[in-house]
């Protein structure tokens, strides 16, 4: 596993910068503004959500990994930011999160087995005029198989291994 994947606070910062420098400007261009509420599915430590919170958005992150959710709460508290983070399977979220004008899926969709059920289920969390932002690694890219998070030092630095 590469260092950037074991140092979760650094990874949080990396995600935050990517979101601030690329996602928010792109979303502003496409939607015309920054939505007031944002839901991220598969949020991990919440790094993608931090710039939205700093911009005054109400943010909610959902992740199946309870450890990541605790880290998100800690990282947000350290930065004096508000965010709601829930450790649950997205299929179990039910009506806890509704009416979001923006749902983020960053490097998540490739991990969902039942994509049709997943995507159709997101509608109940989306506002009538809402948008879903989907980012994913291209399979044909050097690290499209996520081998960079492998525990083997050799495998984690070996591009195209998944092909």
Regions found by a protein language model. Name each.
Residues 1-98, 102:
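Conserved N-terminal segment of class I S-adenosyl-L-methionine
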Residues 50-53, 119-123:
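A structural alpha-helix within SAM-dependent methyltransferase catalytic domains
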Residues 66, 112-113:
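A structural helix-start
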Residues 92, 110, 141:
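Active-site micro-motifs of SAM-dependent methyltransferase domains
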Residues 102-108:
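A short beta-strand submotif of the Rossmann-like class I SAM-dependent methyltransferase core
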Residues 113-121, 131-163:
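S-adenosyl-L-methionine-dependent methyltransferase catalytic module, highlighting the catalytic core
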């Amino acid at each position: 596993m590469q260092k950037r994947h074991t140092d979760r606070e650094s990874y949080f910062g990396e995600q935050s910068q990517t979101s601030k420098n690329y996602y928010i400007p792109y979303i502003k261009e496409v939607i015309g503004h920054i939505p007031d509420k944002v839901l991220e599915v598969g949020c991990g430590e919440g790094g993608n959500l931090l710039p939205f919170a700093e911009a005054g958005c109400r943010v909610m992150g959902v992740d199946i990994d309870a450890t990541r959710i605790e880290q998100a709460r800690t990282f947000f508290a350290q930065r004096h930011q508000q965010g709601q983070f829930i450790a649950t399977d997205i299929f179990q979220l039910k009506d806890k999160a509704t009416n979001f004008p923006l749902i983020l899926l960053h490097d998540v969709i490739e991990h969902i087995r039942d994509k049709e059920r997943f995507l159709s289920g997101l509608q109940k969390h989306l506002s009538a005029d809402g948008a879903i932002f989907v980012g994913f690694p291209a399979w044909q890219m050097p690290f499209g198989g996520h081998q960079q998070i492998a525990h083997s030092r050799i495998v984690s630095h070996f591009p195209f291994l998944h092909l």
